[in-house]
């Protein structure tokens, strides 16, 4: 049985104020083309359909168009909600969608949904478990009665311990949101979402785990549960853009215990690139300008001082400069933060020191200090309210 696995669409997401609707429509159409070419028996979409629990009308239209194209392929599809989604919104109309072969995980009610598909090797049980808090996810996974003599697949949206994170994932402090890969040991393949870097975590029945290189294009596992993050179809941070190939995951299930994983690379409408150099060198480099003109750009200037109106001038050369940083300011900020954190100063003192390092010979005004104090108080009040709610 051939499965196509994707996740973390984050429809409606913006980066540095840039609307990505055209990029998302483009990549979703590319995924539909791959589905038509590969003809999988099922498509697995492992959560974070939207970037917000209350998606915009335009984001909903994009997903609606994608679902229409998906239904037209005639492929059975299994979709769960992630931590960015509202379960009620994503599951709306699910009984009608079932008739078109598109199956949404309902709002979790302690009973993970299971659908049985058949091929020449027998049944494949496909379970859907939407995003849950780690303690609830572990309980839910432990309660599923799995027939281990058959092939079992689960679509899930969790953070498995030892997964490699990128900058675009939201991280919880510590390991409170982690679950062990051993929770998936009853399954042959775990189609996961939540982590944006594609990677495979192979978990043996004996509970020995390893994390593969995210760049691996083909892995095989026999007698193991293969835990796989397909990754997001688009790069949502510059740290992902230069070293990670975005892809869809193709899974081949043959006889019990035989799982083969391959990837098909995706080509985005706009690449995300980081370019670095002096202002003068960057705008005069004709080869660089030609190569990057249409891309989404992060510029790191290595000039010793600020350049007048640098952002506007760069945007006249490169169409989509998203953000601009100065290397010397980053280095100064890092040095200040490291030094001051070691002294365990109060937040206000740390901020004043940071300000003075960035503006040599100039102190914060009384108004700025008052404003800073108000912001710090609001942060602490919000934290205390969260602690009381917990």
Model-predicted regions and their roles:
Residues 1-66, 154, 369, 373-378, ...:
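N-terminal active-site segment of His-dependent metallophosphoesterases
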Residues 117-125, 244, 335-345:
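Short, surface-exposed amphipathic charged segments that create phosphate/polyanion-binding patches used
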Residues 35-39, 120, 146-149, 291-292:
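Glycine-rich phosphate-binding loop signature in dinucleotide/nucleotide-binding domains
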Residues 111-120, 206-220, 229-295:
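Binuclear metal-dependent phosphoesterase catalytic core
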Residues 55-56, 62, 68, 72-226:
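His/Asp/Glu-rich metal-coordinating catalytic cores
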Residues 37, 42, 252-390:
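Accessory, non-catalytic peripheral segments of nucleic-acid enzymes
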Residues 8, 28, 48, 63, ...:
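Divalent metal-coordination and catalytic microenvironments
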Residues 4, 103-105, 127, 228, ...:
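General small-molecule cofactor/ligand-binding pocket signal
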């Amino acid at each position: 049985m051939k499965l196509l696995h994707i996740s973390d669409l984050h429809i409606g997401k913006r980066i540095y104020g840039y609307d990505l609707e055209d990029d998302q429509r483009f990549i979703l159409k590319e995924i539909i083309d791959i589905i038509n070419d590969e003809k999988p028996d099922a498509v697995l979409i492992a959560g974070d359909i939207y970037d917000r629990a209350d998606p915009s009308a335009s984001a909903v239209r994009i997903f609606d168009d994608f679902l229409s194209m998906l239904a037209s392929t005639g492929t059975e599809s299994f979709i769960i909600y992630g931590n960015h989604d509202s379960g009620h919104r994503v599951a709306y109309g699910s009984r009608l969608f079932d008739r078109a072969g598109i199956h949404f995980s309902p709002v979790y009610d302690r009973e993970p949904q299971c659908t049985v598909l058949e091929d020449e090797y027998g049944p494949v049980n496909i379970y859907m478990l939407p995003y849950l808090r780690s303690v609830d996810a572990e309980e839910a996974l432990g309660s599923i009665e799995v027939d281990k003599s058959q092939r079992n697949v689960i679509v899930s949206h969790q953070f498995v311990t030892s997964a490699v994170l990128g900058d675009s994932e939201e991280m919880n402090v510590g390991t409170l949101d982690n679950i062990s890969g051993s929770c998936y040991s009853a399954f042959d393949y775990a189609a996961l979402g939540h982590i944006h870097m594609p990677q495979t975590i192979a978990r043996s029945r004996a509970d020995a785990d390893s994390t593969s290189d995210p760049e691996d294009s083909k892995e095989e596992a026999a007698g193991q549960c293969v835990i796989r993050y397909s990754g997001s179809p688009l790069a949502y941070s510059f740290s992902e853009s230069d070293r990670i190939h975005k892809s869809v995951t193709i899974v081949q299930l043959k006889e019990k215990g035989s799982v083969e994983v391959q990837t098909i690379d995706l080509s985005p409408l706009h690449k995300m690139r980081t370019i670095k150099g002096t202002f003068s060198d960057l705008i005069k480099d004709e080869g660089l300008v030609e190569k990057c003109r249409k891309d989404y750009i992060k510029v790191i200037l290595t000039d010793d001082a600020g350049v007048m109106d640098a952002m506007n001038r760069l945007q006249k050369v490169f169409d989509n400069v998203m953000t601009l940083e100065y290397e010397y300011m980053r280095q100064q900020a890092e040095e200040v933060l490291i030094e001051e954190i070691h002294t365990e100063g109060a937040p206000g003192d740390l901020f004043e020191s940071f300000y003075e390092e960035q503006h040599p010979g100039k102190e914060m005004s009384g108004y700025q200090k008052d404003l800073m104090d108000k912001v710090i108080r609001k942060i602490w009040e919000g934290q205390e309210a969260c602690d009381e709610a917990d």
